[in-house]
Amino acid sequence: MENNSNSGVIYQGKIPNRVKYCFAFGALGKDLIYGMIATFSMIYFTDIIKVAPAFIGSMFFVAKLWDAFNDLFMGMIVDNTRSRWGKFVPWLVIGTLINAFVFITVFTDFHLSGVSLCVFASVVYVLWGMTYTIMDIPYWSIIPNLTSDPEEREKVSVLPRIFASIGQSLIIAGFGVQIIKGLGGNYTGYHRFALIIAATFIFTMAVCVINLPKKQQATGTAEKMKFRDIFTVIKKNDQLRWAVLLILLYNIGIQAIMGVATYYFSYVCNNAGMLSAFMISASVAEVVGLLIFPKVTKLLSRKKAFLMACTLPPIGLILLLIVGFVCPSNIPLTAIAGIIVKTGTGLELGCATVFLADVVDYGEYVLGVRNEGVVFSLQTLIVKLTAAFTALAI
């Protein structure tokens, strides 16, 4: 049943399955693109088109810092958008089309060298991040507007995370190397894979946009947000501050674990091939963690689900350390460690998305205005900042 009140929530109760699954399907394509950039862009720049590794490392750090704070601006722009299509759909369409084009450009060799190659790499990488943000912030900001029913919100929060994990963690991280080799390897493999991913991205987001509810919020003349108002939102919404702190601490821990994994298997276990067993099992486990999230919250509570999410990764890490020193070539135990770590991550992703959706409702109660864009931009800001500083530290 659709909501006819002034609230931004579209459905009072159950969300139609068509809307729910088509919305989630959009995350598959967008995280295929994100996974390709996150996993392979550095090695593509340094090993395929021969950009100096020292330059790429510094450029990536600066670009991620800029991209993180750019999220706040995009969140503000989304919240200020007034159009006949609402405040989310226009940016989903614009961001998807531009980002797909820039993504293909990233994996296209224009046979440059020296300074011109460094400039090219910098421009396309920064542009990719900015155009991805145009689409990503409004995508996640839709969730709190779909329903206020707690059980339905948990389901609609988890589904896109599942598709995102399938795209980024399972397909790209798990099988990306094999796919690139199968498509010709070297530059040809990267370029062909990029074309396939870009086409998939446009298709999945088209399915998402076409099936979104026609009723959209923010077509009126409410006062527009200014940049300084972002800090007012953070200051007056105490639940937002706590949610951001929890997400920050969790991301620091989990990104540090995953960031050192390659070096751990290479230098502690002396077996870099074990990384594959760890990553594939971990990728599957993340999806499983997301799948069981609604059941866990129903049987226990969201609080206990989050405590499980915080407890499982350290347990998996301790097991991994023991395996590394006692039996470094033991594939089953390495896989089990990966499963324990990323099952917790799956639960955390579900918790974080639901927390932020609830924070939007709380903010409307406290401030009298819904700030979906700003609230969800803080999550992506945290993820990008922790990724940048973790990579620099490692």
Positions of PLM-derived features:
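Membrane-embedded alpha-helical bundles of multi-pass transporters/translocases
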Residues: 2-394
